[in-house]
């Protein structure tokens, strides 16, 4: 929209009410998945102006043989979520296999800002291993997970905000989030 209408303003909202999905359960894996989630809300204003984040490209990665690792099923009692312990390994394997494409053929160290959705500590560890990153590369993601939890789609926006407050203009970035499928949504960007 803003490319065809330079004066346009597009408001993007991420509103997640994860606590609505809590259910009474004695299943430890289910309880642990509830414990990392939190409610959250984020907003971004997309304009044609050269300020904030310049969007350089988008990519979706569907990781094969992972369909049942993250699922949402609507039941009479509400949403039933499955969050398998196999998610981190699948993310590491899938990202590693496509690492060169994800970072545009450059080495991972050429990316200055990593805005990775902190689905959990082990997910962040898996991303670090997939790209050979040092622990500091995902410090903003770890801080958001520690301070706010996993707010589903809003979480990566919190990470972007943290990075942009501290980042230098022109820094190259890679943002990514994970979800059912198992899928990874990836955005190349520059701080402007």
Q: Which residue stretches match the model-derived regions?
A:
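Active-site-adjacent elements of ketosynthase-type condensing enzymes
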Residues: 9-32, 59-76, 121-129, 150-158
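Conserved beta-strand/loop scaffold segments within soluble protein domains that form the structured core
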Residues: 3-5, 13, 36
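Secondary-structure boundary elements
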Residues: 1-9, 46-53
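Condensing-enzyme catalytic core mediating Claisen C-C bond formation in acyl metabolism
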Residues: 22-93, 97, 101, 178, ...
């Amino acid at each position: 929209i803003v490319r065809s209408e330079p004066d346009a303003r597009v408001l993007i909202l991420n509103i997640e009410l994860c606590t609505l999905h809590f259910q009474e359960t004695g299943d430890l894996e289910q309880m642990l998945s509830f414990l990392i989630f939190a409610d959250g809300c984020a907003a971004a204003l997309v304009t044609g102006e050269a300020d904030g984040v310049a969007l350089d490209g988008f990519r979706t990665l569907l990781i094969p043989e992972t369909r049942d690792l993250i699922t949402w099923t609507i039941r009479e009692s509400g949403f039933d979520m499955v969050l398998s312990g196999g998610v981190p390994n699948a993310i590491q394997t899938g990202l590693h296999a496509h690492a060169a494409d994800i970072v545009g053929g450059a080495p991972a160290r050429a990316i200055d800002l990593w805005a990775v959705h902190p689905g959990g500590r082990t997910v962040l560890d898996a991303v670090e291993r997939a790209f050979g990153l040092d622990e500091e590369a995902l410090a903003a993601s770890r801080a958001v997970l520690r301070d706010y939890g996993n707010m589903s789609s809003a979480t990566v926006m919190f990470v972007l905000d943290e990075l942009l407050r501290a980042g230098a203009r022109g820094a190259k970035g890679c943002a990514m989030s994970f979800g059912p499928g198992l899928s990874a949504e990836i955005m190349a960007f520059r701080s402007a």
